[in-house]
Amino acid sequence: MRASPVHSSLDPRARQLLRTLISRYIRDGEPVGSQTLARHAGLDVSPATIRNILADLEDAGLLSSPHTSAGRIPTATGYRVFVDSLVQMRPPGEGEVARLRAEMSSAAGTQALLGSASELLSAMTHFVGVVSAPKREQFAFRHIDFVPLDARRVLAILVFADNEVQNRVIEPRKAYEPAELERVANYLNAHFAGRALADIRASLLRELRHARDEMELLLAHSVELAEQALAPAGDDMVLAGQTKLMGVQDLSDLERLRELFEIFASKREILQLLERTIQAPGVRIFIGEETGVVPLESVSLVTAPYMAGGQVLGVLGVIGPKRMDYDRVIPLVQTAADVLGAALDPNPPTER
């Protein structure tokens, strides 16, 4: 976590009061008054001194006073200072880590793993779990087959090294005979199995420049079919637990919930937000307006990239109210990212 400029200007008593107030508010969901802080902050100061410090924190934009209460609640800036400088991590226990590892088994296919990760994050936080899918071009393909569907359409069946199977309908510029499709599939399987999709097209084009006669025709056919069959698929993500937000007190406004569910359905804005975090190591936290997406201004997003084979594949995280238990959610998200990456790694450390 980075040090907040606002935090660095606070004295130890103000930091302790701010942490105690935000922790109590996260736990209880009620504005916190000076009497409560006097009992729980562990400071040997009078309620009057506490009130003065709270007034200073409010002037600094870290707290606000609801009109209906004498207590105070944190602002988005207050939460930012909290997660940057005052959070006290509570890593998941042995049982929780064992559950993550057991349910994100490397024996499952990638899509099943992503589904398990999002479901687990939702179940363990009671908020929304989200996982961006790895870009398929980062994966090696194991086998390809072409099946003619009609005069102009061909079904490409791709089997990847992580046991995922994708079916893609392509429309080549020319009609291919079954024997031609078989020759192209045999060529691609013999020469490119085990290679990442992103590498194959460039290699085909290089070989085509140096080929002659019959080999040139085979390579030309391979380039055309591979260009469509192995093209990058659209980005996607897996969400779980969206309906759990309906029971969150802070998100009880129906119009706000409707806008949130529209964002979940379209996926585009959340994918763009996750893309912003993919190259940043460690946990990233967006609080309210920091997301840059109006319907997400009432929530926080805690994310971490997951890696396999030294390569960042995607991002996972939790979407919940700003009043979430950051002490627990932050290390849980990081642990889940580590476990998912290990499950996706084709060469885990124990096998190297």
Q: Where is each model-derived feature located?
A:
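Alpha-helical hairpin
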Residues: 9-10, 45, 74, 92
